[in-house]
């Protein structure tokens, strides 16, 4: 049995990785992992991902210090996505929020919505200008 790295982005075979707070169940972020990133995550207990924009592996929190300690890894029925149950140290979102899902979409028309249709539902944990 094998993990199914069937999604290809920029020539890299990846799986979808969802980071979830291990205590509350809050979804923190969605990213991609290639085989090496998943292996490194398993070996170190720290979340590693594959950056599709930089085409490189990265350790979550490498520059910000906001790391993810992996407590458990769940695999979906198709073996092409994982949920990382993590202890989030600091914030998961590079924009300064605990979760990347800090906005609520309040519209019935996804083809024509604007900034007023997005409601910020979380407070910032840090100022990105101070970290990046």
From Swiss-Prot:
Principal cellular location given in the protein's record: cytoplasm
Heme as UniProt keyword: no
MF terms (GO), sorted A to Z: magnesium ion binding; phosphoribosyl-AMP cyclohydrolase activity; zinc ion binding
Reactions that this protein is recorded to catalyse: 1-(5-phospho-beta-D-ribosyl)-5'-AMP + H2O = 1-(5-phospho-beta-D-ribosyl)-5-[(5-phospho-beta-D-ribosylamino)methylideneamino]imidazole-4-carboxamide
Entry's cofactor comment: Binds 1 Mg(2+) ion per subunit. Binds 1 zinc ion per subunit.
Function text: Catalyzes the hydrolysis of the adenine ring of phosphoribosyl-AMP.
GO biological process: L-histidine biosynthetic process
A Pfam cross-reference name: PRA-CH
Alphabetical UniProt keywords: Amino-acid biosynthesis, Cytoplasm, Histidine biosynthesis, Hydrolase, Magnesium, Metal-binding, Zinc
Record: residues binding Mg(2+): 76, 78, 80
UniProt similarity note: Belongs to the PRA-CH family.
Subunit annotation: Homodimer.
Keyword Metal-binding: yes
Pathway it works in: Amino-acid biosynthesis; L-histidine biosynthesis; L-histidine from 5-phospho-alpha-D-ribose 1-diphosphate: step 3/9
GO cellular component entries: cytoplasm
NCBIfam families per UniProt: PRK00051.1
Domain of life: Archaea
Record protein name field: Phosphoribosyl-AMP cyclohydrolase
Lineage: Archaea, Methanobacteriati, Methanobacteriota, Methanomada group, Methanobacteria
């Amino acid at each position: 049995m094998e993990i199914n790295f069937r999604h290809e982005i920029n020539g890299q075979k990846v799986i979808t990785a969802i980071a979830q707070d291990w205590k509350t169940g809050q979804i923190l972020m969605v990213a991609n992992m290639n085989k090496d990133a998943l292996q490194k995550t398993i070996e170190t207990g720290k979340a590693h991902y594959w950056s599709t924009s930089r085409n490189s592996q990265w350790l979550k929190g490498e520059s910000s210090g906001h790391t993810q300690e992996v407590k458990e890894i769940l695999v979906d029925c198709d073996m092409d996505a994982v949920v990382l149950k993590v202890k989030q140290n600091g914030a998961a979102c590079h924009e300064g929020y605990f979760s990347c899902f800090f906005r609520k979409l309040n519209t019935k028309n996804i083809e024509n919505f604007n900034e007023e249709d997005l409601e910020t539902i979380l407070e910032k944990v840090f100022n990105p200008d101070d970290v990046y």
